[in-house]
């Protein structure tokens, strides 16, 4: 049994032990946990691709916030069809990711610096286009009354399917996992991603298009961030320019706890799924037992440090 799987099993058993009222045995508990973790999991899918290339992306939370605001503006104010607003927001996120990738791969800027700059830029754009205000479906009428006019796509993306047993956002997360798995396991670009992360110079001498591979990884990370932003806006029923703040830390934590190496070249999307479930169940168990947020953050930090130390020992 691998260390990430063992950690997930331990946390699951703790949930069983410390919930005498049987709350943990109800499917709604697991459904809600998956719903709450799915946005972080979608971000972690993109982060996995980047980290396997031995990179990092600090901008995912800000891109999420920007695309959440843009999706709300296009859907609520501009009344765009979802068939236009969703692809437009996905394109915006992808372009921001590609820009980061170009600076990193072509201009040899450190990933930390390049994505830190993009993090600030995207957050600034989110506040600029929204004037620093939440984009809400509430409209003020001339007579002073307010009406609530929410786009149907918000309700659809925030709904439950399969007779209420599965959240739509969880299905979207599953699709993102599948796409990421296909990229890493079934496509040539996936082999390139592992090669670049394992030894960039050796990969370059072997004919691997290192620059394009890195740009692809960061572009996909931007795309997944946009998808997460769309889901976040639908869940909150508004576009918040502050949405996604510090989400990049959660995404990195999921990838690291799952077992993907921060040094690059090793890891996989199934490990990211394990990391998502581990963090999700940990948060849910602590929430059920009324553990404060400060204690939850401390415990999560300890788990991350432990995961990194285990990686170093295994290496």
Question: What spans do the regions from the language model cover?
Answer:
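Alpha-helical transmembrane segments within multi-pass membrane transporters and channels
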Residues: 79-119, 274-275
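Single transmembrane alpha-helix segments in multi-pass membrane proteins
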Residues: 12-16, 26-78, 103-109, 253-255, ...
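Structural signal for alpha-helical transmembrane segments and their membrane-water exit/capping regions
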Residues: 9-25, 53, 129, 180-188
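Transmembrane helix-bundle core of multi-pass membrane transporters
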Residues: 112-187, 215-216, 236-241, 291
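Helix-loop-helix hairpins and the membrane-proximal interhelical loops
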Residues: 1-38, 230, 234-239
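Cytosolic-side transmembrane-helix boundaries in multi-pass membrane proteins
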Residues: 1-13, 198, 205-212, 282-315
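Helix-loop-helix "hairpin" substructures at the membrane interface of multi-pass membrane proteins
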Residues: 81, 85-86, 95-100, 104, ...
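Transmembrane alpha-helical segments in multi-pass inner-membrane proteins
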Residues: 218-219, 224-225, 235-301
